[in-house]
């Protein structure tokens, strides 16, 4: 680990981990936090605790960035475009997951949180609707900067997850080109490779972990319900293929 430590001491770029929900990102996030040390992370654990264990609204996270200029790691469920608030040489990391698996995990997350009931979820799918945001990976990578500040910025970013996509083609193209610009892109089913890449690049001693597994049992969907999931996530399916 000594050699790694020396590399990290020389590695003076900040790190932005764009944490797309339900991509096994929590395990990576905790490994990164452990490696850089809690004091060097934004949003801070205190701010996250203040929000009941969730990432804080975007404007509060950005406010903390201003207050902690010596941070090493910025991470959260924030769109990739947020990197415009970070130094230009920031090392960027993102993780993609097979889209149908990611959606099922996301639905289970909403069920575990009590945000929807299983009856509602299945009824939505039976009616051809998705009970959670669609094409989340494309939205995170291909979303455009929101020109607002303070609470309005956070509100609009949250609303954007559910807003109808007005131009599928341009969102997809932006997501692909952004995806290709990410310094270190990982995949949920190849996590050891990702840890290896990050360690080599940064010298951080990362430890593989298994965190935040779903607190809700596996879902068993009918073919028709799975078709609904696929139909509503065409962009993410294409993005995953393209990467």
Where are these regions (language model features)?
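PAPS-dependent sulfotransferase catalytic core
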Residues: 2-70, 75-80, 106, 112-114, 189, ...
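Conserved aromatic-histidine-acidic binding/catalytic patches
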Residues: 16-20, 91, 182-190, 224-231
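Short beta-strand/turn micro-motifs composed of small residues
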Residues: 19, 96-97
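A residue-level signal for conserved active-site and pocket-lining positions in enzyme catalytic cores
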Residues: 24, 98, 186, 198, ...
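A generic structural motif
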Residues: 42-49, 103, 208-218
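PAPS-dependent sulfotransferase catalytic domain
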Residues: 49-95, 101-207
């Amino acid at each position: 680990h000594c050699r790694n430590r020396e590399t990290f001491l020389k590695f003076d770029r900040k790190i932005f981990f764009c944490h797309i929900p339900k991509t096994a990102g929590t395990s990576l996030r905790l490994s990164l936090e452990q490696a850089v040390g809690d004091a060097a992370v934004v949003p801070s654990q205190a701010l996250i605790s203040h929000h009941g264990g969730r990432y804080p609204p975007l404007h509060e996270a950005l406010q903390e960035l201003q207050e902690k200029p010596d941070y090493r790691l910025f991470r959260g469920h924030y769109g990739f475009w947020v990197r415009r608030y970070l130094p230009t040489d920031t090392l960027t990391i993102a993780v993609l997951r097979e889209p149908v698996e990611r959606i099922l995990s996301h639905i289970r997350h909403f069920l575990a949180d009590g945000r929807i009931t299983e009856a509602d979820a299945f009824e939505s799918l039976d009616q051809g609707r998705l009970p959670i945001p669609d094409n989340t990976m494309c939205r995170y990578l291909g979303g455009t900067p929101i020109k607002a500040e303070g609470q309005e910025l956070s509100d609009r970013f949250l609303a954007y997850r559910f807003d109808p996509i007005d131009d599928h083609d341009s969102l997809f193209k932006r997501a692909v080109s952004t995806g290709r610009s990410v310094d270190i892109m990982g995949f949920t089913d190849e996590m050891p490779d990702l840890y290896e890449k990050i360690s080599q690049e940064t010298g951080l001693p990362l430890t593989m972990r298994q965190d935040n597994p779903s607190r809700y049992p596996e879902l068993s969907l009918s073919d028709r319900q799975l078709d609904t999931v696929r139909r509503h996530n065409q962009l993410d399916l294409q993005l995953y293929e393209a990467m």
